């Protein structure tokens, strides 16, 4: 096909992967990317964590908050008056789906469910953790050799570094203490180590965190020919995917600045708008596979904060090492992440994904004079991520008779943990207590976060090996029964996982984009 047009719905790391891979393999193509939210940074899709000014960073995060956003409330047709939020407050840069106002979703069993509405999507706000899936987390119908290559390419696109902060002696001391506690129980290659992160280490020891901008790469470089073939339209809402039978013809879009609607013809449409809004768009377009919205999973998370014990730490690090760590941290005080360690998922010994993040301060205020409020050796914030095993009953459904705040069929989420998850949560909580005692003293006891807190929502457009009604997409991310409709994101992951899913979803997107490129006549395919 000569000069094909590809429409991409969503500007996060997954949509950006499709744009990059397709234009690199089909350079005569035209890619138009649509984003309902605003552009936050001069470089489209950059991580807001790279913004040095705290006020500017706060402004960027607020602009991402959809119905709660300030600067764009009225231009988006959202009342400027206060919206009453539900029981939980969304994380900075995100907005609750069930926010308590007119047109909010119904998610009492999944109350912390949230989204980001901005150029770069969650990639503008994420923690940049990029562990690889392992054991049963991997997709069984993708061959191991191909999977390893896909993960390798995903790491390149995201600028993954496996040893960020590895030169931190404080971080090394934390690893040593955890290894003493758990090392003998863990399989070879899956012991305590540094957490792979997406970003580029800087000479001063800080990190320039990766967002969708690094995935887009040459598409944002005005000197690159590929940039001439790429268009990003922010504040543009895709209302529907238009169909002619089982073939997509394009998308109906609304300019949120003017309210005007138009049709954009496309030879291929990629829907990568997140695990709730992508199936919502499909539903609104009349694309309604039996599995759409079902098999919702995330990661139950148990968290705590521990004050590091000076005597324990001094077994592996000196006061001079601590002073050097604090001096380095002073160079980037607005970024709370320093040394980041982990214990990866493994089976059957350790079906959890553990992150241990060092910080010289707690993530919450402490009254002066209270125990450990001024702990010289600092703190670690620890989290055990666990599996949610897929069930058809865990689902987001859509009501054609009740519009949400944007005029789409409104969402309702039904979700429950079972005895299977409860058992793993209990085991993880006990392990977290062991980890805390090995490092110091708890200043925040282990606690299970509300459902939806992980932001790692999966399964609602799951891929499958056969079209048997239990999946939405084929092994190359094409919606079953449609010739040129492709979906992307964490929603495609069909397995129970414990690790941060971004790297896995980018790898899946690379596979899907290569398949599309081949069918469009790519010379590289």
Residue ranges and their predicted role:
Residues 38-79, 116-128:
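Conserved N-terminal glycine-rich FAD pyrophosphate-binding loop of Rossmann-like flavoproteins
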Residues 495-516:
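A conserved FAD-binding loop/helix module that cradles the flavin
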Residues 71-74, 79-91, 105-108, 112, ...:
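Conserved redox-cofactor binding core of oxidoreductases
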Residues 4-33:
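N-terminal Rossmann-like FAD-binding beta1-loop-alpha1 element of flavoenzymes
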């Amino acid at each position: 096909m000569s000069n094909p047009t590809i429409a991409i719905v969503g500007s996060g790391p997954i949509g950006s992967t499709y744009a990059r891979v397709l234009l690199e393999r089909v350079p005569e193509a035209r890619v138009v990317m649509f984003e309902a939210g605003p552009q936050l940074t001069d470089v489209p899709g950059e991580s807001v964590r790279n913004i040095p000014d705290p006020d500017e960073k706060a402004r960027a995060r607020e602009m991402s908050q959809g119905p709660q956003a300030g600067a764009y409330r009225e231009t988006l047709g959202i009342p400027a008056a206060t919206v009453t939020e539900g029981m939980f407050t969304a994380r900075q840069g995100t907005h609750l789906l069930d926010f308590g106002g007119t047109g909010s979703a119904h998610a009492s069993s999944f109350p912390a469910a949230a989204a980001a509405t901005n150029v770069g999507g969650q990639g503008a706000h994420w923690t940049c953790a990029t562990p690889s899936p392992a054991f049963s987390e991997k997709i069984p119908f993708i061959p191991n050799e191909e999977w390893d290559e896909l993960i390798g390419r995903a790491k390149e696109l995201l600028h993954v570094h496996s040893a960020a902060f590895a030169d931190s002696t404080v971080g090394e001391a934390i690893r040593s203490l955890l290894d003493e506690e758990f090392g003998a129980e863990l399989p070879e290659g899956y012991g305590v180590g540094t957490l792979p992160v997406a970003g580029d280490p800087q000479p001063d020891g800080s990190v320039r965190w990766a967002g969708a901008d690094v995935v887009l790469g040459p598409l944002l470089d005005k000197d690159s020919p590929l940039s001439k073939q790429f268009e990003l339209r922010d504040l543009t809402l895709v209302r529907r995917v238009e169909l002619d039978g089982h073939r997509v013809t394009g998308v109906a879009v609304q300019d949120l600045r003017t309210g005007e609607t138009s049709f954009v013809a496309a030879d291929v449409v990629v829907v990568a708008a997140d695990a709730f809004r992508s199936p919502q768009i499909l539903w609104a377009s009349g694309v309604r596979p039996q599995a759409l919205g079902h098999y919702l999973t995330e990661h139950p998370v148990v968290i705590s904060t521990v004050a590091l014990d000076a005597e324990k730490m001094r077994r592996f690090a000196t006061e001079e090492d601590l002073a050097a760590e604090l001096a380095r941290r002073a160079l980037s005080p607005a970024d709370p992440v320093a040394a980041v360690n982990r214990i990866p998922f493994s089976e059957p010994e350790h079906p959890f994904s553990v992150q241990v993040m060092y910080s010289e301060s707690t993530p919450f205020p402490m009254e002066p004079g209270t125990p450990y409020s001024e702990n010289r050796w600092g703190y670690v914030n620890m989290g055990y991520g666990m599996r949610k095993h897929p069930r058809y009953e865990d689902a987001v459904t859509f009501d054609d008779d009740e519009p949400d705040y944007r005029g789409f069929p409104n969402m309702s989420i039904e979700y429950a943990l079972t005895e299977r998850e409860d058992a793993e949560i209990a085991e993880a909580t006990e392990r977290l207590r062991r980890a805390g005692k090995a490092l110091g003293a708890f200043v925040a006891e282990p606690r299970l976060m509300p459902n939806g807190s992980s932001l790692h929502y999966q399964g609602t457009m799951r891929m499958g090996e056969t079209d048997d009604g239990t999946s939405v997409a084929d092994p190359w991310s094409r919606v079953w029964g449609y010739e040129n409709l492709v979906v992307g994101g964490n929603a495609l992951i069909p397995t129970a996982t414990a690790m941060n899913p971004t790297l896995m979803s980018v790898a899946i997107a690379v596979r899907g984009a290569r398949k599309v490129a081949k069918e469009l006549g790519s010379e590289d395919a």
